[in-house]
Amino acid sequence: MTTFTRTITLVCYGSIALAIVGVFGTWRTAGAVSLDGLEGPYNGWLVIIFALIVIAGGRSLSRGGWLGIILVAGCAGVMILTGVEDLSDDVLGGRSGWGIWLTIAASSVLAGVAVYSGVKRVRGSRRGEPRTSP
């Protein structure tokens, strides 16, 4: 396992762990009421489901496989969208909590890792010289 592969794997799994921790953290506070990502109108369960799917594609992403890159990028996009949508949906009033911000930030790092791996894969697959026939 190369240093790059190990680093991508650690960042990927660390981001997944932080996103799940964020789901169980405070997403909205209104007075004495505090809700996490699984309570009330929030869709934190989607973040958990897609984070578990990303675990399956994490190794493929770290090796630079297209299936892993696309899987992680798509799941991270859904995780970001879920957090941003719940953040902008101000049904209860009050203010946003640390959990929703942690979930959005960790999901954004996960998407960034997928984009970085995709760019590295594309740049690494180009040849320096034009191909000639034998």
Regions found by a protein language model. Name each.
Residues 1-134:
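Compact integral membrane and secretory-pathway proteins
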